[in-house]
Amino acid sequence: MEYNETYFKKSANRKVMLIWVLIASILTIAYGIEYAKGGRELGYVLAFIAICWIPIVLSFIIVKIKGWENSICKETVTIGYGVTYAFALLTANTNISFVYIFPVISMLILYKDRKLIIRSGIYNVLLLIVNVVIRAVQNKITPTDVTDYEIQFACII
């Protein structure tokens, strides 16, 4: 069977969108549970859900207009999930939220686009740096946090 670029793009976009919807669904449920436990305010949870789902809806609109074989989808996934990830990371109550990047990196591998993965990796490292700087300015870094941040950078790089 020879390589068919149109088939590959359709297949990759469908798989990535399915995974993205599954991740967003899990995160929506998790943040809903967090609200129910009193860990987050309703406004925060609604903002998170909007930030999480609006890029997905926009991506499906693009797919409807341009077709499943379009090249724009991988960019909307990367940017959309990147915004969701940034919001979650920078507003998290825990240092473990950096792991939210792993599903998107796994999804992006389906595109077999090295430059896209490198750009995403650089974005992630910059976000981790921004997160550490913000926490340092707020004087919210403990010795345990320093170890956590070292582990985060080691995992990402």
Annotate each predicted stretch with a short phrase.
Residues S11-A12, S71, L116:
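Short alpha-helical segments used as structural interaction elements across diverse proteins
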Residues S97-F98, R119:
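Alpha-helix N-cap/helix-start motif
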Residues I29-I51, L110, R114-I157:
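Alpha-helical transmembrane segments and their interfaces in multipass membrane proteins
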Residues E2-Y3, E41, T91, K140:
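Secondary-structure junction/capping motif
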Residues L90-I96, K112-K115:
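Transmembrane helix interruption/hinge and helix-loop junction motifs
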